[in-house]
Design a protein with these regions (language model features):
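Conserved N-terminal structural module of periplasmic/extracytoplasmic solute-binding proteins
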Residues: 2-99, 111-116, 293, 329, ...
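Extracytoplasmic/periplasmic solute-binding protein
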Residues: 135-139, 144, 167-216, 223, ...
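C-terminal capping/gating helix-and-loop segments adjacent to ligand/active sites or protein-protein/ligand interfaces
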Residues: 363-456
Length: 475
Protein backbone atom coordinates (compact mmCIF):
# COMPACT_ATOMS: atom_id res chain seq x y z
CA UNK A 1 0.00 0.00 0.00
CA UNK A 2 1.19 3.53 -0.69
CA UNK A 3 0.94 4.67 2.94
CA UNK A 4 3.04 1.73 4.08
CA UNK A 5 5.73 2.50 1.51
CA UNK A 6 5.76 6.11 2.69
CA UNK A 7 6.21 5.12 6.34
CA UNK A 8 8.85 2.56 5.42
CA UNK A 9 10.93 5.35 3.89
CA UNK A 10 10.75 7.39 7.07
CA UNK A 11 11.60 4.38 9.19
CA UNK A 12 14.68 3.54 7.12
CA UNK A 13 15.95 7.06 7.67
CA UNK A 14 15.51 7.02 11.42
CA UNK A 15 16.20 3.34 12.14
CA UNK A 16 19.92 3.58 12.89
CA UNK A 17 19.52 6.56 15.21
CA UNK A 18 16.65 4.95 17.07
CA UNK A 19 18.64 1.79 17.53
CA UNK A 20 21.23 3.84 19.40
CA UNK A 21 18.59 5.32 21.66
CA UNK A 22 17.20 1.90 22.49
CA UNK A 23 20.69 0.60 23.18
CA UNK A 24 21.44 3.48 25.55
CA UNK A 25 18.18 2.88 27.38
CA UNK A 26 19.03 -0.79 27.78
CA UNK A 27 22.51 -0.08 29.07
CA UNK A 28 21.23 2.46 31.54
CA UNK A 29 18.67 -0.02 32.80
CA UNK A 30 21.34 -2.66 33.44
CA UNK A 31 24.07 -0.48 34.88
CA UNK A 32 22.02 1.78 37.12
CA UNK A 33 20.35 -0.57 39.59
CA UNK A 34 19.17 2.40 41.66
CA UNK A 35 17.46 4.06 38.71
CA UNK A 36 14.04 5.08 40.02
CA UNK A 37 12.88 6.99 36.97
CA UNK A 38 9.46 6.31 35.53
CA UNK A 39 9.88 4.44 32.24
CA UNK A 40 7.46 5.06 29.41
CA UNK A 41 7.38 3.29 26.06
CA UNK A 42 6.74 5.29 22.91
CA UNK A 43 5.83 3.98 19.46
CA UNK A 44 6.72 6.49 16.77
CA UNK A 45 8.22 6.65 13.29
CA UNK A 46 9.09 10.37 13.54
CA UNK A 47 12.70 10.77 12.25
CA UNK A 48 13.57 13.45 14.81
CA UNK A 49 12.17 11.54 17.80
CA UNK A 50 15.56 10.44 19.20
CA UNK A 51 16.65 14.08 19.44
CA UNK A 52 13.32 15.06 20.99
CA UNK A 53 13.64 12.30 23.58
CA UNK A 54 17.13 13.42 24.52
CA UNK A 55 15.92 16.97 25.16
CA UNK A 56 12.82 15.78 27.00
CA UNK A 57 14.80 13.57 29.37
CA UNK A 58 17.15 16.47 30.10
CA UNK A 59 14.19 18.62 31.15
CA UNK A 60 12.38 15.75 32.88
CA UNK A 61 15.06 13.77 34.74
CA UNK A 62 12.43 11.67 36.53
CA UNK A 63 11.27 10.04 33.26
CA UNK A 64 13.09 7.67 30.90
CA UNK A 65 11.73 7.10 27.41
CA UNK A 66 12.10 3.88 25.44
CA UNK A 67 11.51 4.42 21.75
CA UNK A 68 10.12 1.65 19.57
CA UNK A 69 9.96 2.39 15.85
CA UNK A 70 6.84 0.84 14.40
CA UNK A 71 4.42 1.44 11.57
CA UNK A 72 1.34 -0.41 10.47
CA UNK A 73 -1.79 -0.68 12.53
CA UNK A 74 -1.80 -4.46 12.34
CA UNK A 75 1.01 -4.41 14.92
CA UNK A 76 -0.94 -2.19 17.28
CA UNK A 77 -4.13 -4.19 16.83
CA UNK A 78 -2.32 -7.43 17.56
CA UNK A 79 -0.83 -6.10 20.79
CA UNK A 80 -4.20 -4.69 21.83
CA UNK A 81 -5.80 -8.08 21.22
CA UNK A 82 -3.05 -9.88 23.15
CA UNK A 83 -3.36 -7.42 26.03
CA UNK A 84 0.35 -7.02 26.74
CA UNK A 85 3.43 -5.33 25.32
CA UNK A 86 1.55 -2.14 24.57
CA UNK A 87 3.27 1.25 24.61
CA UNK A 88 2.18 4.11 26.82
CA UNK A 89 2.32 6.66 24.00
CA UNK A 90 1.55 6.08 20.34
CA UNK A 91 1.83 8.12 17.16
CA UNK A 92 -1.23 7.77 14.95
CA UNK A 93 -2.11 9.24 11.61
CA UNK A 94 -5.18 11.44 11.76
CA UNK A 95 -7.20 9.07 9.61
CA UNK A 96 -6.64 6.20 12.07
CA UNK A 97 -7.14 8.13 15.30
CA UNK A 98 -10.93 7.89 15.33
CA UNK A 99 -10.80 4.11 15.08
CA UNK A 100 -8.87 3.85 18.34
CA UNK A 101 -10.89 6.58 20.03
CA UNK A 102 -14.23 4.92 19.28
CA UNK A 103 -12.96 1.52 20.41
CA UNK A 104 -11.88 2.98 23.76
CA UNK A 105 -8.13 2.49 23.31
CA UNK A 106 -7.12 6.16 23.71
CA UNK A 107 -7.13 8.15 26.93
CA UNK A 108 -9.49 11.12 27.07
CA UNK A 109 -7.16 14.11 27.59
CA UNK A 110 -9.78 16.84 27.28
CA UNK A 111 -9.30 18.10 30.85
CA UNK A 112 -5.52 18.22 30.38
CA UNK A 113 -5.61 20.48 27.32
CA UNK A 114 -7.85 23.32 28.40
CA UNK A 115 -6.98 26.40 26.38
CA UNK A 116 -5.02 24.51 23.73
CA UNK A 117 -7.59 24.79 20.93
CA UNK A 118 -6.49 28.16 19.55
CA UNK A 119 -2.86 27.11 19.44
CA UNK A 120 -3.33 24.68 16.54
CA UNK A 121 -4.72 25.02 13.04
CA UNK A 122 -8.47 24.36 12.86
CA UNK A 123 -8.01 21.33 10.62
CA UNK A 124 -5.59 19.50 12.90
CA UNK A 125 -7.42 20.40 16.11
CA UNK A 126 -10.63 19.08 14.62
CA UNK A 127 -8.84 15.85 13.65
CA UNK A 128 -7.81 14.96 17.23
CA UNK A 129 -11.36 15.19 18.53
CA UNK A 130 -14.41 13.04 18.30
CA UNK A 131 -17.63 14.84 19.13
CA UNK A 132 -15.86 17.33 21.38
CA UNK A 133 -13.63 14.88 23.26
CA UNK A 134 -9.88 15.31 22.73
CA UNK A 135 -7.91 12.07 22.36
CA UNK A 136 -4.49 13.27 21.17
CA UNK A 137 -2.45 16.35 20.33
CA UNK A 138 -1.52 17.32 16.77
CA UNK A 139 2.11 16.49 15.95
CA UNK A 140 2.30 17.73 12.40
CA UNK A 141 0.00 18.50 9.53
CA UNK A 142 -0.49 17.80 5.86
CA UNK A 143 -2.36 20.68 4.24
CA UNK A 144 -2.60 19.99 0.54
CA UNK A 145 -0.43 21.95 -1.89
CA UNK A 146 0.33 21.93 -5.61
CA UNK A 147 3.97 20.95 -6.23
CA UNK A 148 5.12 21.37 -9.82
CA UNK A 149 8.20 21.22 -12.03
CA UNK A 150 8.42 24.80 -13.25
CA UNK A 151 10.86 23.92 -16.02
CA UNK A 152 8.43 21.43 -17.58
CA UNK A 153 5.46 23.77 -17.23
CA UNK A 154 7.40 26.55 -18.93
CA UNK A 155 8.25 24.21 -21.81
CA UNK A 156 4.50 23.82 -22.33
CA UNK A 157 3.94 27.58 -22.04
CA UNK A 158 2.09 27.33 -18.73
CA UNK A 159 2.28 29.65 -15.73
CA UNK A 160 1.46 27.16 -12.98
CA UNK A 161 1.07 29.90 -10.37
CA UNK A 162 -1.97 31.11 -12.36
CA UNK A 163 -3.77 27.77 -12.00
CA UNK A 164 -6.58 28.49 -9.54
CA UNK A 165 -9.52 26.36 -10.68
CA UNK A 166 -9.92 22.74 -11.70
CA UNK A 167 -10.67 23.93 -15.21
CA UNK A 168 -7.33 25.80 -15.24
CA UNK A 169 -5.69 22.55 -14.17
CA UNK A 170 -7.53 20.60 -16.86
CA UNK A 171 -6.39 23.02 -19.58
CA UNK A 172 -2.80 22.83 -18.30
CA UNK A 173 -2.96 19.03 -18.40
CA UNK A 174 -3.96 19.14 -22.06
CA UNK A 175 -1.03 21.41 -22.93
CA UNK A 176 1.38 19.14 -21.08
CA UNK A 177 0.00 16.13 -22.93
CA UNK A 178 0.86 17.88 -26.20
CA UNK A 179 4.55 17.78 -25.26
CA UNK A 180 4.31 14.15 -24.12
CA UNK A 181 4.06 14.75 -20.38
CA UNK A 182 1.46 13.84 -17.75
CA UNK A 183 0.41 16.52 -15.30
CA UNK A 184 0.27 13.87 -12.55
CA UNK A 185 -0.04 10.17 -11.78
CA UNK A 186 -2.69 8.36 -9.78
CA UNK A 187 -3.19 4.61 -9.72
CA UNK A 188 -5.92 4.71 -7.09
CA UNK A 189 -4.81 6.17 -3.74
CA UNK A 190 -7.46 6.35 -1.01
CA UNK A 191 -5.70 9.07 0.96
CA UNK A 192 -5.49 11.27 -2.14
CA UNK A 193 -9.10 10.56 -3.05
CA UNK A 194 -10.41 11.42 0.41
CA UNK A 195 -8.35 14.63 0.51
CA UNK A 196 -9.72 15.74 -2.85
CA UNK A 197 -13.30 14.99 -1.78
CA UNK A 198 -12.64 17.01 1.39
CA UNK A 199 -11.29 19.83 -0.81
CA UNK A 200 -14.46 19.67 -2.91
CA UNK A 201 -16.59 20.21 0.20
CA UNK A 202 -17.57 16.59 0.61
CA UNK A 203 -18.51 15.15 3.99
CA UNK A 204 -19.53 11.55 3.21
CA UNK A 205 -18.74 10.00 6.61
CA UNK A 206 -20.22 10.73 10.02
CA UNK A 207 -20.08 8.99 13.39
CA UNK A 208 -22.64 9.65 16.11
CA UNK A 209 -21.71 11.14 19.46
CA UNK A 210 -21.78 7.78 21.20
CA UNK A 211 -19.64 6.19 18.47
CA UNK A 212 -22.24 3.53 17.73
CA UNK A 213 -23.91 4.81 14.57
CA UNK A 214 -22.03 5.46 11.33
CA UNK A 215 -23.26 7.08 8.15
CA UNK A 216 -21.66 6.39 4.75
CA UNK A 217 -23.05 8.62 2.00
CA UNK A 218 -20.52 8.29 -0.80
CA UNK A 219 -23.11 7.81 -3.54
CA UNK A 220 -25.17 10.88 -2.58
CA UNK A 221 -22.55 13.35 -1.31
CA UNK A 222 -22.17 16.41 -3.57
CA UNK A 223 -18.44 16.73 -2.95
CA UNK A 224 -17.86 13.10 -3.88
CA UNK A 225 -19.75 13.62 -7.13
CA UNK A 226 -17.96 16.90 -7.87
CA UNK A 227 -14.45 15.51 -7.61
CA UNK A 228 -15.20 12.06 -9.03
CA UNK A 229 -16.76 13.51 -12.19
CA UNK A 230 -13.79 15.84 -12.68
CA UNK A 231 -11.19 13.13 -12.11
CA UNK A 232 -13.05 10.69 -14.35
CA UNK A 233 -12.84 13.26 -17.13
CA UNK A 234 -9.10 13.67 -16.56
CA UNK A 235 -8.59 9.91 -16.70
CA UNK A 236 -10.87 9.36 -19.70
CA UNK A 237 -8.92 11.93 -21.72
CA UNK A 238 -5.60 10.32 -20.84
CA UNK A 239 -4.40 13.29 -18.80
CA UNK A 240 -3.49 11.28 -15.68
CA UNK A 241 -0.99 8.42 -15.71
CA UNK A 242 -2.89 5.59 -14.02
CA UNK A 243 -0.01 3.13 -14.43
CA UNK A 244 2.33 4.58 -11.80
CA UNK A 245 1.77 3.86 -8.13
CA UNK A 246 2.66 6.68 -5.78
CA UNK A 247 5.99 6.10 -3.94
CA UNK A 248 7.07 3.41 -6.39
CA UNK A 249 10.55 3.58 -7.92
CA UNK A 250 8.97 4.14 -11.33
CA UNK A 251 6.96 7.07 -9.98
CA UNK A 252 10.07 8.69 -8.53
CA UNK A 253 11.92 8.20 -11.81
CA UNK A 254 9.05 9.83 -13.70
CA UNK A 255 9.15 12.83 -11.37
CA UNK A 256 12.90 13.07 -11.86
CA UNK A 257 12.74 12.85 -15.66
CA UNK A 258 9.89 15.34 -15.94
CA UNK A 259 7.51 12.72 -17.35
CA UNK A 260 5.26 13.52 -14.38
CA UNK A 261 5.15 17.30 -14.06
CA UNK A 262 3.38 17.86 -10.75
CA UNK A 263 1.57 16.36 -7.79
CA UNK A 264 -0.99 17.27 -5.17
CA UNK A 265 0.47 16.34 -1.79
CA UNK A 266 0.63 17.30 1.87
CA UNK A 267 3.00 19.94 3.19
CA UNK A 268 5.35 17.18 4.36
CA UNK A 269 6.39 16.66 0.73
CA UNK A 270 9.42 19.03 0.45
CA UNK A 271 11.90 16.87 2.36
CA UNK A 272 10.70 13.76 0.49
CA UNK A 273 11.12 15.46 -2.88
CA UNK A 274 14.67 16.36 -1.91
CA UNK A 275 15.43 12.79 -0.82
CA UNK A 276 13.65 10.94 -3.63
CA UNK A 277 14.03 13.37 -6.55
CA UNK A 278 17.34 15.12 -5.80
CA UNK A 279 17.89 15.97 -9.45
CA UNK A 280 14.85 18.22 -9.36
CA UNK A 281 16.54 20.70 -7.04
CA UNK A 282 15.98 24.22 -8.31
CA UNK A 283 13.33 23.12 -10.80
CA UNK A 284 10.35 22.62 -8.51
CA UNK A 285 7.98 25.19 -7.01
CA UNK A 286 4.88 25.06 -4.85
CA UNK A 287 1.62 26.95 -4.93
CA UNK A 288 -1.81 26.66 -3.36
CA UNK A 289 -4.31 24.04 -4.46
CA UNK A 290 -6.62 24.71 -7.38
CA UNK A 291 -10.24 24.25 -6.33
CA UNK A 292 -13.46 23.58 -8.20
CA UNK A 293 -14.43 27.26 -8.27
CA UNK A 294 -11.14 28.96 -7.39
CA UNK A 295 -12.13 29.72 -3.79
CA UNK A 296 -9.56 29.65 -0.99
CA UNK A 297 -10.33 26.39 0.75
CA UNK A 298 -8.18 23.37 1.46
CA UNK A 299 -7.97 19.88 2.94
CA UNK A 300 -5.48 17.74 4.81
CA UNK A 301 -3.67 14.75 3.36
CA UNK A 302 -1.57 12.99 5.97
CA UNK A 303 -0.21 14.29 9.20
CA UNK A 304 -0.23 12.62 12.57
CA UNK A 305 -1.04 13.04 16.23
CA UNK A 306 0.29 11.61 19.47
CA UNK A 307 -1.90 10.14 22.16
CA UNK A 308 -1.83 8.12 25.36
CA UNK A 309 -3.24 4.60 25.38
CA UNK A 310 -5.87 4.07 28.03
CA UNK A 311 -4.14 0.88 29.13
CA UNK A 312 -1.13 2.80 30.47
CA UNK A 313 -0.35 2.71 34.17
CA UNK A 314 1.62 5.95 33.84
CA UNK A 315 -0.83 8.45 32.34
CA UNK A 316 0.78 11.53 33.89
CA UNK A 317 4.29 10.76 32.68
CA UNK A 318 2.95 9.69 29.30
CA UNK A 319 1.01 12.92 28.85
CA UNK A 320 4.02 15.00 29.87
CA UNK A 321 5.89 13.46 26.96
CA UNK A 322 3.02 14.03 24.52
CA UNK A 323 2.78 17.62 25.69
CA UNK A 324 6.51 18.16 25.17
CA UNK A 325 6.47 16.68 21.68
CA UNK A 326 3.35 18.46 20.46
CA UNK A 327 2.93 21.58 22.60
CA UNK A 328 6.32 22.60 23.96
CA UNK A 329 8.04 25.15 21.71
CA UNK A 330 11.41 23.40 21.91
CA UNK A 331 9.95 19.98 21.15
CA UNK A 332 8.09 21.35 18.15
CA UNK A 333 11.16 23.24 16.90
CA UNK A 334 13.30 20.10 16.98
CA UNK A 335 10.80 18.18 14.88
CA UNK A 336 10.28 21.02 12.41
CA UNK A 337 14.05 21.27 11.97
CA UNK A 338 13.97 17.56 11.16
CA UNK A 339 11.47 18.03 8.34
CA UNK A 340 8.05 17.86 10.01
CA UNK A 341 5.48 20.43 8.93
CA UNK A 342 4.00 22.11 12.01
CA UNK A 343 0.43 22.00 13.24
CA UNK A 344 0.78 24.89 15.71
CA UNK A 345 -0.03 28.48 14.83
CA UNK A 346 3.02 29.91 16.59
CA UNK A 347 5.43 28.16 14.24
CA UNK A 348 3.27 28.85 11.19
CA UNK A 349 3.46 32.57 12.01
CA UNK A 350 7.15 32.59 12.89
CA UNK A 351 9.14 34.95 10.65
CA UNK A 352 12.18 32.67 10.52
CA UNK A 353 10.06 29.69 9.54
CA UNK A 354 8.23 31.65 6.85
CA UNK A 355 11.46 33.06 5.41
CA UNK A 356 12.97 29.61 4.86
CA UNK A 357 14.19 29.04 1.29
CA UNK A 358 16.17 25.82 1.81
CA UNK A 359 15.59 22.23 2.92
CA UNK A 360 18.18 20.44 5.03
CA UNK A 361 19.30 17.15 3.50
CA UNK A 362 20.48 13.98 5.27
CA UNK A 363 24.04 15.33 5.44
CA UNK A 364 23.02 18.61 7.02
CA UNK A 365 23.38 20.67 3.85
CA UNK A 366 20.83 23.40 3.14
CA UNK A 367 19.48 22.91 -0.38
CA UNK A 368 17.44 25.59 -2.24
CA UNK A 369 15.22 22.90 -3.72
CA UNK A 370 12.46 25.31 -4.72
CA UNK A 371 14.79 27.73 -6.44
CA UNK A 372 14.90 30.24 -3.60
CA UNK A 373 11.12 30.34 -3.13
CA UNK A 374 9.87 31.04 0.40
CA UNK A 375 7.90 27.81 0.24
CA UNK A 376 6.75 27.80 3.86
CA UNK A 377 4.74 30.97 3.21
CA UNK A 378 2.68 29.05 0.66
CA UNK A 379 2.32 26.02 2.91
CA UNK A 380 1.36 28.10 5.95
CA UNK A 381 -1.41 29.75 3.93
CA UNK A 382 -2.50 26.29 2.81
CA UNK A 383 -2.75 25.19 6.45
CA UNK A 384 -4.90 28.18 7.39
CA UNK A 385 -7.31 27.45 4.54
CA UNK A 386 -8.16 23.90 5.65
CA UNK A 387 -11.90 23.55 6.19
CA UNK A 388 -13.27 21.79 9.25
CA UNK A 389 -16.03 19.23 9.62
CA UNK A 390 -14.41 16.29 7.85
CA UNK A 391 -14.71 12.97 9.68
CA UNK A 392 -12.87 9.76 9.02
CA UNK A 393 -14.58 6.44 9.50
CA UNK A 394 -14.06 4.59 12.80
CA UNK A 395 -12.77 1.76 10.59
CA UNK A 396 -10.80 3.97 8.20
CA UNK A 397 -7.82 1.62 8.08
CA UNK A 398 -10.03 -1.08 6.58
CA UNK A 399 -11.75 1.42 4.29
CA UNK A 400 -8.48 2.51 2.73
CA UNK A 401 -7.38 -1.04 2.12
CA UNK A 402 -10.75 -1.79 0.53
CA UNK A 403 -10.52 1.24 -1.78
CA UNK A 404 -8.01 -0.51 -3.99
CA UNK A 405 -10.27 -3.49 -4.67
CA UNK A 406 -13.36 -1.35 -5.30
CA UNK A 407 -12.67 2.13 -6.67
CA UNK A 408 -9.27 0.86 -7.76
CA UNK A 409 -10.92 -1.33 -10.38
CA UNK A 410 -11.74 1.81 -12.38
CA UNK A 411 -8.05 2.71 -12.47
CA UNK A 412 -7.19 -0.84 -13.47
CA UNK A 413 -9.68 -0.67 -16.34
CA UNK A 414 -8.21 2.64 -17.49
CA UNK A 415 -4.68 1.23 -17.39
CA UNK A 416 -5.74 -1.88 -19.31
CA UNK A 417 -7.52 0.26 -21.90
CA UNK A 418 -4.47 2.49 -22.30
CA UNK A 419 -2.13 -0.46 -22.77
CA UNK A 420 -4.46 -2.04 -25.31
CA UNK A 421 -4.74 1.23 -27.23
CA UNK A 422 -0.96 1.71 -27.28
CA UNK A 423 -0.39 -1.86 -28.47
CA UNK A 424 -3.06 -1.45 -31.14
CA UNK A 425 -1.56 1.81 -32.42
CA UNK A 426 1.91 0.29 -32.63
CA UNK A 427 0.55 -2.67 -34.56
CA UNK A 428 -1.20 -0.40 -37.05
CA UNK A 429 1.88 1.79 -37.48
CA UNK A 430 4.22 -1.14 -38.04
CA UNK A 431 1.81 -3.28 -40.04
CA UNK A 432 2.96 -6.32 -38.08
CA UNK A 433 0.46 -9.18 -38.45
CA UNK A 434 2.34 -11.29 -35.91
CA UNK A 435 2.12 -8.49 -33.35
CA UNK A 436 -1.63 -8.22 -34.00
CA UNK A 437 -2.03 -11.83 -32.94
CA UNK A 438 -0.26 -11.02 -29.68
CA UNK A 439 -2.43 -8.03 -28.75
CA UNK A 440 -3.70 -8.13 -25.17
CA UNK A 441 -7.36 -8.85 -24.67
CA UNK A 442 -9.59 -5.75 -24.84
CA UNK A 443 -10.49 -4.50 -21.35
CA UNK A 444 -14.24 -5.08 -21.74
CA UNK A 445 -17.02 -2.67 -20.68
CA UNK A 446 -15.76 0.43 -18.91
CA UNK A 447 -15.65 0.43 -15.12
CA UNK A 448 -16.12 4.01 -13.95
CA UNK A 449 -15.03 5.55 -10.68
CA UNK A 450 -18.67 5.91 -9.63
CA UNK A 451 -19.11 2.18 -10.25
CA UNK A 452 -16.25 1.64 -7.83
CA UNK A 453 -17.64 4.17 -5.36
CA UNK A 454 -20.96 2.32 -5.28
CA UNK A 455 -19.15 -0.95 -4.58
CA UNK A 456 -16.96 0.72 -1.94
CA UNK A 457 -20.01 2.07 -0.12
CA UNK A 458 -21.69 -1.33 -0.09
CA UNK A 459 -18.51 -2.94 1.25
CA UNK A 460 -18.16 -0.32 3.98
CA UNK A 461 -21.76 -0.67 5.11
CA UNK A 462 -21.44 -4.45 5.25
CA UNK A 463 -18.14 -4.25 7.14
CA UNK A 464 -19.45 -1.67 9.60
CA UNK A 465 -22.51 -3.79 10.31
CA UNK A 466 -20.35 -6.85 10.92
CA UNK A 467 -18.21 -4.80 13.32
CA UNK A 468 -21.26 -3.99 15.43
CA UNK A 469 -21.97 -0.45 14.21
CA UNK A 470 -25.44 0.71 13.29
CA UNK A 471 -25.14 1.85 9.69
CA UNK A 472 -27.58 4.64 8.88
CA UNK A 473 -28.37 7.15 6.17
CA UNK A 474 -27.85 10.01 8.62
CA UNK A 475 -25.89 9.36 11.85
Amino acid sequence: MTRVRFLERLIRRVGIMAGVVLLISTVCGCAAAADTRTVIRVWSWEPSMPAVIKDFEAENPDIRVELDIRSGYDNLNRFIQDGYGLPDVVQLEYFALGQYAVSGQLLDITDRVTGYAGQYTPGTWSSVQLNGTVYALPMDSGPMAFFYNEDVFQQAGIDASAIHTWNDYYEAAKKLKEIGVYITADAGDASFYNAMVWLAGGRPFHTSGDGKTVSVQLTTDAGVARFTEFWQRMIDEGLVDTRLTTWSDEWEQALGSGQIASLFAGAWMPSLLLADVPGGSGLWRVTTMPTADGSSTNAENGGSAMGVLRSTRKPDAAFRFVDYVCHNAEGIATRVAGGAFPADNATLNDDQFLARTTITDARGNDIPYFGGQRFNEVLADAARDVSVGWQYLPFEVYARNDFKSTVGTAYEWSTAALRYRIAQERTEQEGDDDRAERLPDPPGPQVTMMDGIDLWQRDLIEYGTNQGFTMADDA
